[in-house]
Amino acid sequence: MKAFTQHTGLVAPLDRANVDTDQIIPKQFLKSIKRTGFGPNLFDEWRYLDVGQPGQDCSARPLNTGFVLNLPRYQGASVLLARENFGCGSSREHAPWALDEYGFRTVIAPSFADIFFNNSFKNGLLPIILPEAEVDELFRQCESTEGYRLTVDLAAQTVTRPDGKALSFEIDPFRKHCLLNGLDDIGLTLRDADAIRVFEEKHRQASPWLFGAIK
């Protein structure tokens, strides 16, 4: 998993509340369990005018030119600004996969659905909760300023605006540690691989009858 330490990026404002996971990545794209290939289909039903299908060449599809991610000023955005209850709906890790592959490193919102919130941390995407008044001000500044960028410092737990004002956010210490060090569940397990092997060998010697059928 990619570590997250500090990131400065262009902000795209998605001014919609209760964005659900089927809107983030529609159900027809969930047939694959690979973590790649979902970026072109992020917000598929909003980005395009047709109905997308798995494996389709998205470069030839008709665009919804009014959708925020299709506007020239937001091309290359890596910070998504959203409204309350972002990521509600069914559980699917494909949602953070799609956001990550598109290029987003972090999503800032007043609140998130719990399952999406947890899945994001496990896949290297940083969900940041800020008070609604602060999010409102970020929307105002972003929409009135072309090229609006924010700096997220995970170690300091701050989001810094272009005017220098730093906004503080809370994060669970363990999740912070994992993101700073790029540790997902597999990475955490592999970090203790030597200790696991030692335990298994001691267990085998203490209870050999449990391993008689194992070759």
UniProtKB/Swiss-Prot annotation:
**GO molecular-function annotation terms?**
3-isopropylmalate dehydratase activity
Q: Which domain of life is it from?
A: Bacteria
Single biological process term from Gene Ontology: L-leucine biosynthetic process
Q: Name one GO cellular component term.
A: 3-isopropylmalate dehydratase complex
Q: Which cysteines are joined by disulfide bonds?
A: none
Gene3D superfamilies on file: Aconitase, domain 4
Which top EC class applies here? lyase
For this UniProt record, the keywords arranged alphabetically read as follows: Amino-acid biosynthesis, Branched-chain amino acid biosynthesis, Leucine biosynthesis, Lyase
* E.C. designation(s): 4.2.1.33
Quote the catalytic activity from the record.
(2R,3S)-3-isopropylmalate = (2S)-2-isopropylmalate
The record's section on Pfam families has: Aconitase_C
User: Which range is the signal sequence, renumbered to this chain?
Assistant: none
Q: What does this protein do?
A: Catalyzes the isomerization between 2-isopropylmalate and 3-isopropylmalate, via the formation of 2-isopropylmaleate.
Q: How does it assemble?
A: Heterodimer of LeuC and LeuD.
Q: Which family does it belong to?
A: Belongs to the LeuD family. LeuD type 1 subfamily.
What is this protein identified as?
A: 3-isopropylmalate dehydratase small subunit
What is the species of this protein?
Answer: Azotobacter vinelandii
Task: List the top taxonomic levels of the source.
Answer: Bacteria, Pseudomonadati, Pseudomonadota, Gammaproteobacteria, Pseudomonadales
